[in-house]
Amino acid sequence: ELVDAGVKELKTADEVNEVLSQQNGTVLLIVNSVCGCAAGNMRPGVKLSIQHDKKPSKLTTVFAGVDGEAVAQARKYFLPYPPSSPSIALFKDGDLVHFLERHHIEGGSAQMIAANLQAAYDEYC
């Protein structure tokens, strides 16, 4: 669903490092999962958010429970935040600038998630 919307899957630790070690531009990294809140809220929210005028220059995802190596490497970049799936991270010039944890996604509508991300895009992209 995210890949169909133009989001690139990262399947290895090296692919995660290649994208997140870049020191210029913005990167959205989505930790996808099979849970209901990812399917019902997060993925639709991300898809809505990237219809905004401003958006990250790179859209990427790792899949918890499927791409373990890539997810473990991505989570190193999320510190000091604890592991959370699903979650959404926005990086600017190599720095983590915005992060939505599972508890921000659960119970939130796709529209709320999109609005939160779009506000971050306005500030950082």
Identify the meaning behind each predicted range.
Residues 33, 38-46, 58-59, 70, ...:
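Amphipathic alpha-helical interface surfaces
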Residues 43-47, 74-78, 101-104:
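"Short basic amphipathic alpha-helical interaction patches in structured regions
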Residues 18-53:
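Local sequence-structure signature of Cys/Sec-based thiol-disulfide redox active-site neighborhoods
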Residues 1-23, 125:
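N-terminal leader/targeting and pre-domain segments
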Residues 71-85:
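Short acidic (Asp/Glu) patches
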Residues 82-125:
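Non-catalytic, surface beta->alpha helical segment in thiol-disulfide oxidoreductase systems
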Residues 31, 54-73:
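Thiol-based oxidoreductase modules, predominantly thioredoxin-like and allied folds used
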